[in-house]
A protein has these predicted regions:
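Residues forming the flavin
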Residues: 1-349
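Basic, glycine/lysine-rich polyanion-binding surfaces/domains
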Residues: 15, 188, 286, 290, ...
């Protein structure tokens, strides 16, 4: 999480580092979002980035026969990765009516993979006798969230979904940044960043690799100039987008029989979100608490955007007005062992600590502070305490309570104010 004054607890392996940063650069990327359709929770349905991770990081072929649901050009990269891994790609179901193909998309077309433009997966069907994806029903899109009455069924045991992203906004919002929504790109964006705080890369709405690198270099120069390690001119901001957004505006397709899951953690369907608004819980914060959407292990990472879209539609508000629920620390689960930390505490000493030592004080731990317990050798502890008590009682004593803090009382009636609750008179 992020805490006041750029205090960042960072977990690395078994250790928690407590970092107080002068400047912070967040390059935490974006979170891929799911499409919402009937039976979208069947095993065999996964995000395109999940399929790519299985292939490239773990060397696992995620299926044998695949369909790719694409609302952006990233889906075509996934299709090529699947082909290279030995998966038979039946088709790319393209949500966009008129997609702008890049080189990767054209490479998929050149391989003879059918592209079903302006279409959606309306329903996923389990294989007979199995609780696993067996086929998908593909229909033409008739309008926002609506499909035509008839379609075609494609046999497959793998469906890869690439319909958009949302920035990993949690830490930035904890620091005071604001989350807005850009209707043109159908994406959440981050604005009003606090001082000493930079973002770069896909969290900043950049997707091209060269643009991401340039943005990171710019953020680093701003931070390094601020702390004085370099003195270089900062280049102009990288163009935020090239007009080809990775987000499809409405990958949500209700089905009369339900089971179109918005939040997989809490088994929440489209109707659960809509009914919450009909019951009077129209604010997205209340929708969360009434429906428990976003309260599971993923903490809304994969449901916040779809929920905001549904709540906005149901309440006749914009998605920017609807927003998302408050992101609070911790961002990721932390073990009790991390919180326990090492068995030591900071040593705090008053301004006259060493004068106490010169006077023969034996120190004790009072909270976080070293304070004198008594003056004299430990073997004469009780005698020393008795002598100090007698001295203070019969003569005078001075005690240093600066370690306890203080209250600054000002004003013409300050003295009378103190007189009224202290056991002695100040004035």
């Amino acid at each position: 999480g992020w805490f006041a004054d750029n205090w960042l607890p960072i977990i690395q392996g078994k250790r928690l580092h407590k970092v107080r940063a002068k400047e912070t650069i967040m390059c935490v990327g974006a979170l891929e979002q799911q499409a919402v359709f009937r039976n979208n929770d069947l095993p065999g349905i996964m995000l395109s980035s999940a399929a790519q991770r299985l292939i490239h990081l773990y060397g696992v072929r995620p299926g044998t026969t695949a369909v790719v649901l694409a609302g952006n050009n990233d889906g075509y990269g996934t299709a090529l990765d699947l082909i290279d891994a030995g998966v038979n790609v039946r088709a790319v179901v393209e949500l966009r009516q008129q997609p702008q193909y890049d080189e990767v998309a054209r490479a998929v077309i050149d391989k003879g993979i059918p592209i079903e433009t302006g279409s959606a997966v309306y329903e996923a069907l389990a294989a007979p006798g199995k609780n696993h994806l067996g086929s998908v029903e593909v229909r033409k899109i008739a309008g926002e969230g609506r499909c035509e009455d008839n379609g075609v069924t494609l046999q497959c045991d793998l469906l890869c979904v690439a319909v958009g992203y949302t920035p990993t906004y949690q830490l930035v919002c904890q620091a005071g940044g604001k989350l807005s929504y850009d209707d043109d790109s159908a994406m959440f964006t981050l604005t009003d960043l606090p001082d000493a705080y930079q973002i770069a890369g896909s969290i900043n709405g950049l997707w091209n690799l060269d643009a991401v690198r340039a943005d990171a270099r710019r953020a680093a120069l701003i931070a390094c100039n601020a702390i004085g390690t370099v003195h270089q001119e900062v280049p102009a901001a990288v163009a935020a987008r090239d007009g080809n957004s990775p987000n499809f505006s409405w990958p949500i397709f209700p089905h009369p029989q339900g089971k179109e899951f918005v939040d997989f953690d809490e088994d929440l369907q489209i109707d659960d979100i809509i009914n919450a608004t009909r019951d009077g819980y129209e604010h997205v914060q209340l929708v969360k608490r009434y429906s428990t959407c976003g309260m599971g292990p993923s903490q809304g990472r994969h449901s916040a955007l779809a929920t905001a879209r549904l709540v906005a539609s149901a309440t006749q508000k914009t998605i920017a007005q609807t927003g998302v629920t408050t992101a609070r620390p911790p961002f990721a689960p932390e073990r009790l062992g991390h919180s326990a930390g090492r068995s030591f505490y900071p040593q705090r000493r008053s301004n006259i600590h060493y004068r106490h030592i010169e006077a023969g004080a034996q120190m004790l731990q009072a909270g976080a502070w070293d304070r004198p317990a008594y003056y004299g050798p430990p073997e004469l502890r009780q005698d020393c305490i008795n002598a100090e008590v007698n001295h203070v009682r019969n003569k005078v004593g001075i005690v240093d309570v600066s370690t306890l803090g203080g209250i600054d009382v000002r004003g013409p009636d300050a003295g009378e104010f103190l007189n009224r609750f202290y056991t002695f008179g100040f004035v």
